[in-house]
């Protein structure tokens, strides 16, 4: 455990995302986000500003600068790091589903979604991410992941170096995970925590999306033994919080 590692306060805010309406979604976040200084990290769902509007992916990707500007202001005003994904133009001519990690001073790290959901045709419009990204925040090493990446344990494997140091302490997952597969969502979050001996935060949307697909949320914060620390109410907007304990984590790694 690093000497500068203190408990980390995590908030996962599940939202009923307005379809292709960034202004409405920005207003929702403003109305429901934690008070300034009350947490260390705030997570928002995948494609938080537009919903998972894949048929209009290239169109909504052009709106990305406004979403990033909003996240930057939110982090600065809240005094916490903010994580969310946004559709952005990719150099290949396709679109990237990009996890933005933005700190209060404006420092920004990004990670593109690696695993595309071919059944829904994501591979036709989206470019795959190539890098496993870990950020360090207030002494914690945090791995960034987007939705379907959760299903791939090899991609998220937490390895130890020669000194027994793990790649990361916590896994952050932002998603638009359908209600029909809620059991897979909750099971996989716990599985990733247990197999990687790390904390896990999973944030999901609620409500019915533009395809008519319902989402129940089931956002949750998981301990390194797969134990449930906090769970959001199903089908309701709002955030759930928990504190991650570095001492507890260090004892598990012994």
PLM ranges: what are they?
Residues 253-254:
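Conserved small/polar residues in nucleotide/adenosyl-binding loops
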Residues 42-43, 141-146, 172-173, 201:
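Short hydrophobic-aromatic micro-motifs
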Residues 50, 100, 111-117, 220, ...:
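Short beta->alpha transition motifs characteristic of CBS
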Residues 22-23, 30-104, 109, 178-192, ...:
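Cys-nucleophile CN-hydrolase/nitrilase-fold catalytic domain and related Cys-dependent amidase chemistry
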Residues 90-166, 179-187:
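Active-site catalytic loop in hydrolytic enzyme cores
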Residues 84-86, 98-101, 133, 219-221, ...:
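Short beta-strand scaffold segments in enzyme catalytic cores
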Residues 1-41, 172:
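N-terminal active-site segment of His-dependent metallophosphoesterases
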Residues 66-83, 150-238:
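CN hydrolase (nitrilase-like) catalytic-core segments centered on the catalytic cysteine
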